[in-house]
Amino acid sequence: MKRVAILTTDLYQPHCDVNDHFNLAFLYALAQQEKLQLGGIMLDEDKPDPEITPEICGDPSVESIAQLNYITAIPVPCAIGSRIPLRCEEDIQVVISSGKKIPSISLLLGILESTNLPVDIHMCGGTRDVLLASRIRPDLFTKDRVRVFVNAGTWKIQTPLEYNVRLEPYTFSQLFQLPCQVLWAPCFDEAVWPFHVTEFANYFMMEIGPLFERISDSMKNYFLYMFDRVVNTGWFTYLRGSVNQESLSKWSQQKRCMWSMPGFLMTADCYVDTDGNVTDNPENSVFDYVPVKVSCSPDGLVNWKLCAESEETNIKIFHVRNTEKYEEAMCTAAYETISCLGK
């Protein structure tokens, strides 16, 4: 049975982190291949904290979603989330009791109410909107039909806190109390550069050049619109224009950090073997998720331990089964998956 994917993302134009635009393209590619149904995009409202991320970012990037909607002919809805900080339980109750409608939460709850398909929520940005939705309608977050993929945190050394956890430690901590299945993918072993592939983190580094060699002109323009931090409103004209070869050459030399894509593949019931092939066979997969017991303090510090399959838990942690092959395999899978767009 095909699953519905919902993405929460801190996607901006001009961008904050280019990875968010790659995540978006990867999900659309899986939807175009009919491996999942892309139900909606929940956009973070708040700008990044300048003390954490000094880059100047724009508004939530509805342009990027519109570009991919056009390229794929898949009309995916999007909505913008809450801007009210949630630092404690009292803050959550104040927002809920106000009765004010929050667009992204309305989108999420509407999908959960209307579909008979299982739903996967991929959290690749802020944590507040999904948590608020789960408090408003906990009956919709049942273990048998909803999985929440939490792409945040570190699994080994937790100081300093990873970016998304540091933004709102309390809401992050509450995600582990959700009644549905929770699949936690830490970003790193510790949030200190340089980053490395490690056993329980989904980070990998990807060269941009090999992707640009494979993709259509419209997808090149999708990425260049983001990389060049274009601020004019002509996103559609830009998408259909000629490719700026100088810019393409410049960005082809880059390497960029990637996360989250393994979880998207799980929604598609797919895995990646050691040669980078996307397959439905988990036998030779470079990653999986394994059951854990988790507790998390209100300040975002996680204590976890592996547990046996027979032990009762609704939480799993991301696991790299082959640390030597993982990065290369994930890069190959990303290149081949995204290359289908616009062709």
Go through each PLM region and give its residues.
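Conformational coupling and interaction surfaces
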Residues: 1-5, 23-38, 166, 185-343
